[in-house]
Amino acid sequence: MAYRKLGRTSSQRKAMLRDLTTDLLINESIVTTEARAKEIRKTVEKMITLGKRGDLHARRQAAAYVRNEIASESYDEATDKYTSTTALQKLFSEIAPRYAERNGGYTRILKTEPRRGDAAPMAIIELV
């Protein structure tokens, strides 16, 4: 299996990819290095495909990978309560239905100027 090491041990690399994947699902666009963007593209595409399947097994597989972070909060004045949506809920309720008619290619990578300081090639990865 071909993958990039990204200058980290395997556990650090897996944790970083999980974090970046979750951040992309929450924010729908992030700025990172080109190598990281190309790596998280694989995992995000898999998560959206699981979201499109939508069954219990797919939800559990996605829950095992995506971090349990709050994607959005809203306040309901009528009931005087806050409601929050996690990244997993957003994946299955908002993102996956958006790509119901699309077979892959859910992300776009746009190259930007090199990072100041170490001139690392930077990119913006976003959901199409």
Swiss-Prot record:
Gene3D superfamilies membership: Ribosomal protein L17 (3.90.1030.10)
PROSITE patterns noted in UniProt: RIBOSOMAL_L17
Transmembrane stretches, start-end: none
An example Gene Ontology biological process: translation
InterPro entries: Ribosomal_bL17 (IPR000456), Ribosomal_bL17_CS (IPR047859), Ribosomal_bL17_sf (IPR036373)
Keywords, sorted A to Z: Ribonucleoprotein, Ribosomal protein
SUPFAM superfamilies linked: Prokaryotic ribosomal protein L17
GO MF: structural constituent of ribosome
GO CC field: cytosolic large ribosomal subunit
Name of one Pfam family that matches: Ribosomal_L17
Domain of life: Bacteria
Key word Ribosomal protein present: yes
Assembly and binders: Part of the 50S ribosomal subunit. Contacts protein L32.
NCBIfam families in the cross-refs: L17
UniProt-listed PANTHER family: LARGE RIBOSOMAL SUBUNIT PROTEIN BL17M (PTHR14413:SF16), RIBOSOMAL PROTEIN L17 (PTHR14413)
Family affiliation: Belongs to the bacterial ribosomal protein bL17 family.
Name of the protein this chain belongs to: Large ribosomal subunit protein bL17
Gene this chain is encoded by: rplQ
